[in-house]
Amino acid sequence: MSNTAYIDTCYGPVADDVIQRAANIRLLICDVDGVMSDGLIYMGNQGEELKAFNVRDGYGIRCLITSDIDVAIITGRRAKLLEDRANTLGITHLYQGQSDKLVAYHELLATLQCQPEQVAYIGDDLIDWPVMAQVGLSVAVADAHPLLLPKAHYVTRIKGGRGAVREVCDLILLAQDKLEGATGLSI
């Protein structure tokens, strides 16, 4: 039997170790496809790429930013619509077209003067693991690649693109006693 202690949250029980890790977070890094979106790529008649983003995720991101917790995006793909979404949310650290996400990660650490234990990363696939292995709180979305799930410190109860980012934002805010007073913007 495990000696792990759990804290009750609105998302269900969360291991005390995860709450302790979340209490130290100053930066949340998000992947996009499969995390901020459902992983599907919609193509318009003119070849334009379309994605759906969850408003709850956006609100959670705004709550983090207004609580002085930085948010960054590191993604392997490039899309103009992602620049627009990042601007809408107030995310100023956007790294697109990153086949090696560690390069952007190390740049963020230097720019924001963060230690690895102050960083949370939420991903869904094997390309995310090199960064996840180095951060203080590694998170996999509920429908992440099966090999990623057992490696993460925390697995969301909600699937990518369906509010998983909001779940992580709430967890960080809860751990830092900022959830009750957190407010974002209507987005």
From Swiss-Prot:
Gene of this entry: kdsC
Residues involved in substrate binding: 33, 54-58, 62, 77, 85, 101
Cofactor requirements of the protein: Mg(2+)
Known pathway: Carbohydrate biosynthesis; 3-deoxy-D-manno-octulosonate biosynthesis; 3-deoxy-D-manno-octulosonate from D-ribulose 5-phosphate: step 3/3; Bacterial outer membrane biogenesis; lipopolysaccharide biosynthesis
Organism of derivation: Yersinia pestis
Subunit description: Homotetramer.
Keyword set includes Magnesium: yes
Metal-binding listed as a keyword: yes
Enzyme Commission designation: 3.1.3.45
Domain of life: Bacteria
One Gene Ontology molecular-function label: metal ion binding
Family: Belongs to the KdsC family.
A Pfam family matched in the record: Hydrolase_3
Protein name per Swiss-Prot or TrEMBL: 3-deoxy-D-manno-octulosonate 8-phosphate phosphatase KdsC
